[in-house]
Each structure stands twice: as structure tokens, then as C-alpha cells.
Amino acid sequence: MAASSLTVTLGRLASACSHSILRPSGPGAASLWSASRRFNSQSTSYLPGYVPKTSLSSPPWPEVVLPDPVEETRHHAEVVKKVNEMIVTGQYGRLFAVVHFASRQWKVTSEDLILIGNELDLACGERIRLEKVLLVGADNFTLLGKPLLGKDLVRVEATVIEKTESWPRIIMRFRKRKNFKKKRIVTTPQTVLRINSIEIAPCLL
């Protein structure tokens, strides 16, 4: 019985000591203690309907604000009008184009020479039209295709000026101490085209 009463007394003493240690003392102790309790209660309680900002509640990237459709339509009409005026007056400088021909993309302008790594079924002097035009640009504007520009909008013409063969390549195979040696000379046909003209329609729309 004495041991149990001693244990209870020691427990109460330890609890009182811990409360006295944790609770601040002094002239401003009451206000400091109330302020700390109020801060803890505010930090752990949220307003009704509040959702913390996390990667699940909102994406980590910044929000993209789309332009007003009416304003975008008006701006598009102004740009098309300016481009049409430059095309009509011819104040757009030298044109360049990106065309897809012979399984490759070529950036060309007038009087350029391009070397095709295969033989075309055309004679020298024949004129052809490059129909797959991906892009046409000038000093102040650029027309992009999705993926190609219309045939009635852009016209790129070229002329076959030369049909020749590539420089010979020597392929040599040799096995030492086997008396094996094999030599092969490889040449590939080539075609040279000259870009004659790049023309665009006088009106985009």
C-alpha cells in the first residue's frame, strides 16, 4: 500500500514538473502561451472547402491562358490582310521553300542546284514541278503546311540539267593467309536539278 501511494505521488510530481517546464513563466507568459496555442490550432485546422495545393489538386506546370476566340480571329484577319498586300505589291523579297523530293527534304531558292542520288525517268532539259511543298518563306512572313501547302497556293518548278554517275567507290575484301582478295567498284546514278522559280498565289484566302 505504501509502495503504490509512493508511485502515485512520484507520478503526480513528475507531471507537475513537466507542466512547469513546458509552460513558460514570466510577465508575458500568459499571452505567449495563448498565442502559441492559437497558432497551433490555426495551422492544423482548415476552412471548409479548402483544398491544399499539391500535385494531385493542381498540375505542377503553370496554367496556360488561352486567347479570346474573337480577338484571335480579328488578329488572324489582320495578318492575312497584311500578307496579301505584300504579295500583291511584290514587297516580300526573295522567296525560299522546303520541298520533299526523292525521299528527302530540300531547302531551296531560285537558281539553286540540288543533286539527287538516283536516276529520274526524265531527259535533260525537261521541266518538272515539285508538288510536295512543306514551307514557303520570305523576309517578313512564312507559310507553313499541315503538312503540305496547297498546289493552288505555291508553285515550285525545276529543270533537269545533268544526268551523271557518282564518283567510283572501291570496296575491297581481303582475308590474310587465305589467298582471298575481292575488289568491287560501285557507282550510283545521279541527277542534277536547277530550281527555276518559286511562286505564290496573289491572294491567300
Swiss-Prot record:
**Biological process (GO) annotations?**
mitochondrial translation
Classification via InterPro entries: bL21-like (IPR028909), bL21-like_sf (IPR036164), Ribosomal_bL21 (IPR001787)
The transit peptide segment here is 1-39
Its subcellular locations are:
Mitochondrion
Q: Which UniProt keywords apply?
A: Mitochondrion, Ribonucleoprotein, Ribosomal protein, Transit peptide
Name a single GO cellular component. Answer: mitochondrial large ribosomal subunit
Q: What is its main location?
A: mitochondrion
Task: Provide any one GO MF term from the record.
Answer: structural constituent of ribosome
Q: Which Pfam families match?
A: Ribosomal_L21p
Please give the family membership noted in the entry: Belongs to the bacterial ribosomal protein bL21 family.
What NCBIfam families does this protein map onto? L21
The protein's assembly and partners: Component of the mitochondrial large ribosomal subunit (mt-LSU). Mature mammalian 55S mitochondrial ribosomes consist of a small (28S) and a large (39S) subunit. The 28S small subunit contains a 12S ribosomal RNA (12S mt-rRNA) and 30 different proteins. The 39S large subunit contains a 16S rRNA (16S mt-rRNA), a copy of mitochondrial valine transfer RNA (mt-tRNA(Val)), which plays an integral structural role, and 52 different proteins.
* UniProt name for this protein: Large ribosomal subunit protein bL21m
